[in-house]
Amino acid sequence: MDTVSLAWAALMVVFTFSLSLVVWGRSGL
């Protein structure tokens, strides 16, 4: 696994986490 794919994987994880965090915050959890 090269550095570029690893960086993309990390970016997707962070993006998904922050997006779900925003959704949870908006729904009043």
Curated annotation (Swiss-Prot):
Q: Name one Pfam family in it.
A: PetN
Q: How does it sit in the membrane?
A: Single-pass membrane protein
Q: Which UniProt keywords apply?
A: Chloroplast, Electron transport, Membrane, Photosynthesis, Plastid, Thylakoid, Transmembrane, Transmembrane helix, Transport
Q: Which GO terms describe its biological process?
A: cytochrome complex assembly; photosynthesis
Q: Name one GO cellular component term.
A: cytochrome b6f complex
Subcellular location, principal: plastid
Entry's InterPro entries?
Cytochr_b6-f_cplx_su8_sf, Cytochrome_b6-f_cplx_su8
Source domain of life is Eukaryota
**An example Gene Ontology molecular-function term:** electron transporter, transferring electrons within cytochrome b6/f complex of photosystem II activity
Q: TM segments?
A: 3-23
* Localization, UniProt: Plastid, Chloroplast thylakoid membrane
Q: Which HAMAP family does the UniProt entry name for this protein? A: Cytb6_f_PetN
As for family, the record states: Belongs to the PetN family.
Q: What does it do? A: Component of the cytochrome b6-f complex, which mediates electron transfer between photosystem II (PSII) and photosystem I (PSI), cyclic electron flow around PSI, and state transitions.
Quaternary structure and interacting proteins, as annotated: The 4 large subunits of the cytochrome b6-f complex are cytochrome b6, subunit IV (17 kDa polypeptide, PetD), cytochrome f and the Rieske protein, while the 4 small subunits are PetG, PetL, PetM and PetN. The complex functions as a dimer.
Protein's recorded name: Cytochrome b6-f complex subunit 8
| The species this protein was found in | Chloranthus spicatus (Chulantree)
Give the taxonomic lineage as stored in the record: Eukaryota, Viridiplantae, Streptophyta, Embryophyta, Tracheophyta
